[in-house]
Amino acid sequence: ERFSKAAKQIIDTGLNCLGTTTTPEFGLTGTTESLRFGATCNPWNPAYSTGGSSGGSSALVAAGVVPIAHANDGAGSIRIPASCCGLVGLKASRGRIKDKEVPGYLPANILHDGVVTRSVRDTWAFHAEIEKNIPAEEYPAIGNISDSFPEKLKIAVLTENCLGENSPDELVQATHDVARLCDSLGHKIEMISNPFYRKFDEDFWLLWAHFGFLIRYSVGKELSSKFDHTQLEQWPKYLIARHWKNIHRVPLAFWRLRRFVSQYENFMQNFDILL
């Protein structure tokens, strides 16, 4: 048996591994559907999607089968199914759980492991237990949920998406409601304009297509003769084709993304939370 660093860290807390859950092929889409297993249905209403890619985990937790399940996230794969299934899905800061290893030339490591649960308390308890075995030295200790939190936070509030467009009214309203709650608790609230640069979405799509390419070739190398790339589903095939079609654009896109990572880290020096 072989365990990733994150898997070993989770198992070392004493959690029991019951089995694997459904994901889309290679976890590359925001819904959990595959040719092999079909669609994973939302337990609240089987006519709806669980979201993805950690849809199987989210369905099990939402249905009450287990109180907590492993999930991971590159571009929303914890947060999307948590939202669809009415759960808590936290993509924690890099390093809270041991990161997946990615090639050093990538502009950032966006692949994070985590869990989905039914309450903030459960998610907090999981991360507090994780750090007992392998603390995240670059961050303050999480501690127990019963501890007080006397420090007042500076919270940036953003209601635009990464394209600079307004989000749907109900999402804007929910964001303002949370901001007012935080303000009532004594935290400092500041509305901000969109910090993302104009080509961010285009560059991120090139990064995502590159992930499709990386996964296809790393899996092919791992399985060698057992891997038949002609059996890939349409979405991975599309991403790989998009990567090759736009490969001349990748270096500049990665440079802009790497620059944005640095700019964003500087931006967050002025705030504790971006809401």
Predicted segments, located by residue:
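Acidic carboxylate-rich catalytic motifs and surrounding loops in phosphoryl-/glycosyl-chemistry enzymes
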Residues: 21, 191-198
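Charged, often glycine-rich, active-site loop that binds/positions anionic groups
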Residues: 34, 38, 201-214
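Residues within well-ordered alpha-helices
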Residues: 5-6, 30, 56, 178, ...
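Short glycine/serine-rich loop segments
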Residues: 11-127
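Short helix-loop capping/hinge segments that flank enzyme active sites or metal/cofactor-binding pockets
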Residues: 1, 149-158, 207-265
